[in-house]
Amino acid sequence: MRQATVTRATKETEITVWLDLDGTGQYEVSTGIGFLDHMLEQVSRHSLMDLRVHAKGDTHIDFHHTTEDTGLAIGQAVTQALGDRKGIQRYGSALIPMDEALTQVAVDLSNRPYLIWKVDFSRDKLGDMDTELFKEWFQAFSQTAGVTLHVANHYGENNHHIVESCYKALARALRQAWEIDPRKADAVPSTKGVLGGTL
């Protein structure tokens, strides 16, 4: 069973995450940030990862700490659930439209975190959430999930559609990457024999 539970507690946030990579896309998400909840629900539904996230943070200041720490906690849980990463496909990509917006995401579950973010917004906020925080979430997730992550929005006008296409594309790419390859179920997908470290 590729499941994990992570609890993260600081002076700024308290977060508990449970996930199952081999789920059916069931979710229970409560971060105190409505738009972030909506995006995490998309990740669960479209990756088929079962996900429970409960977070309390200093949202009376702003949403930065809760957004970033939620990304860190989910990424850490993914790393734990993947274990030694034997048998995974490792790579995944998705090109996802949402109405007028089109976004491409490519991932490598290499255990070498890196983010390329080619996404621009025409507004500073979506609802009460600063649009700059979406990059912060992806950065935090990539760091603790050990994923090389490229996110490129090709075009779009509606900022909600742009962001949602990013999260949905991430979900689809992750679903491909962490699927088990039945021909190599006991092998690490690297000529080095391990995933991580330097090239």
From Swiss-Prot:
Database matches in Gene3D superfamilies: Imidazole glycerol phosphate dehydratase, domain 1
Signal peptide per UniProt: none
Any one GO molecular function term: imidazoleglycerol-phosphate dehydratase activity
Pathways involved: Amino-acid biosynthesis; L-histidine biosynthesis; L-histidine from 5-phospho-alpha-D-ribose 1-diphosphate: step 6/9
EC number per UniProt: 4.2.1.19
Cellular component, GO annotation: cytoplasm
Keyword Amino-acid biosynthesis among record annotations: yes
Protein's GO biological process: L-histidine biosynthetic process
Localization: Cytoplasm
Sorted UniProt keywords: Amino-acid biosynthesis, Cytoplasm, Histidine biosynthesis, Lyase
Catalysed reaction, written as an equation: D-erythro-1-(imidazol-4-yl)glycerol 3-phosphate = 3-(imidazol-4-yl)-2-oxopropyl phosphate + H2O
This protein's record includes keyword Cytoplasm: yes
Source superkingdom: Bacteria
Family to which the UniProt record says this protein belongs: Belongs to the imidazoleglycerol-phosphate dehydratase family.
PANTHER family cross-referenced by the UniProt entry: IMIDAZOLEGLYCEROL-PHOSPHATE DEHYDRATASE (PTHR23133:SF2), IMIDAZOLEGLYCEROL-PHOSPHATE DEHYDRATASE HIS7 (PTHR23133)
Name the record gives this protein: Imidazoleglycerol-phosphate dehydratase
Species, as recorded: Rhodospirillum rubrum (strain ATCC 11170 / ATH 1.1.1 / DSM 467 / LMG 4362 / NCIMB 8255 / S1)
Phylogenetic lineage: Bacteria, Pseudomonadati, Pseudomonadota, Alphaproteobacteria, Rhodospirillales
Gene (name only): hisB
